[in-house]
Amino acid sequence: MPVFGNATDIRFNGISATKAYLNNNVAWQLTNYSAGLYKTTYAGYHNETPSFFATATLTTYGANPATSVQTTAISEPSSDDGSNFSVQWLGYFKPTTTETYTLYISSDDGSYLWIGANALSGFTTANANINNGGAHGSVEVSTTISLTAGTYYPIRMQFGEIGGGDVFTFNYSTPTISKTTNVTGLVFYNPTTNGF
């Protein structure tokens, strides 16, 4: 857990970091990280319960340093037949410009996104920046947030599939950046702790 005091230089889960407060959220300036988000896949649907991932059966794991964060017709364990699984991505989002970002998630079925302090702890469906929960066809939900260039914001995304199609796509846009899935150079994770 981060230390919420007056110190500016700390060690955070084995990563050197500098604390900064922005828009009532805690952000971190990381000095040790790897490109991508840390992705884990679990057996079973999360049932709109963010804590599901703490005790669920892990099926695959590893960094996902792709240029975009997508799950479309993904390969899943044969025991799940690709119809009953959940995925979580952990890491940091580092904006390239200081402005208002619109973050989007399209999913089939339920998905959630937290960015800032709630991504680290205390995350619930009620405080999710994006709540696209429930069993449904492909639906897009968005949120806007003011972000500062070069600051590493904790980000957590969760997705679940419970039958039918399986789609998860993360996009972002700003007044100066057209809507895109390309997160090259914007997402990072802690290689020591596999996430934060």
Question: Residue spans of the language-model regions?
Answer:
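Intrinsically disordered, compositionally biased repeat/linker segments
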Residues: 1-30
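Acidic/polar, compositionally biased interaction segments
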Residues: 31-196
